[in-house]
A protein has these predicted regions:
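Structured aminoacyl-transfer and RNA-binding surfaces used for tRNA recognition/handling
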Residues: 1-166
Length: 166
């Protein structure tokens, strides 16, 4: 399947709207009212207060498509893996659901909406670190969805830990 970026955005938006999510409009690439950073570096940036417990006016199920800028690996720009500006697509549950729904839904998006053969997928799980145990629940869910164990890779907090900084 060959898609234009506008088609991918539409498929992503439609999928999450069918799951009861509301779109959070993107914030500017140079964020206003955030003295902690020069640029918007992730889709979660504007949602930090909500991820910490503050209710969001649009509800508990959200998605966004956020222009993001990252410069921490700027010396590597130009290879096939590094960019400075990109659009980050994300869906968010603010205490409404967790892995048991999220992982099968994302698998559904990849395999049904984007027609990616499940046998071609590789996934990562958190191997544990920084006082946080291994994520065996995600491992079991991916395995149950048919992802072979040799395609489920475990990484520690140095390689597989999401943070605002990316």
């Amino acid at each position: 399947m060959s898609l234009k970026h506008t088609e991918l955005r539409k498929l992503f938006s439609n999928f999450w709207e069918k799951k009861g999510h509301k779109e959070v409009p993107p914030i500017p690439l140079v964020p206003q009212n955030d003295p902690t950073t020069l640029f918007t570096g992730s889709g979660m940036q504007q949602l930090v207060p909500n991820l910490l417990g503050e209710p969001h006016p649009l509800g508990k199920r959200l998605y966004n498509i956020q222009r993001s800028f990252r410069s921490q690996d700027i010396e590597e720009i130009g290879d096939n893996r590094h960019t400075t500006m990109f659009e980050m697509m994300g869906n968010w549950s603010l205490g409404d659901y967790f892995k048991q729904e999220q992982i099968p839904w994302f698998h559904e998006f990849l395999t049904k909406e984007l027609s990616i053969d499940s046998k071609r997928l590789f996934v990562t799980i958190f191997a544990g670190g920084s006082g946080v145990p291994k994520d065996t629940e995600s491992y079991d869910l991916w395995k149950k969805l048919g992802i072979p164990t040799d395609r489920i890779h475990e990484y520690d907090d140095k390689k597989n830990w999401w943070s605002r900084a990316g």
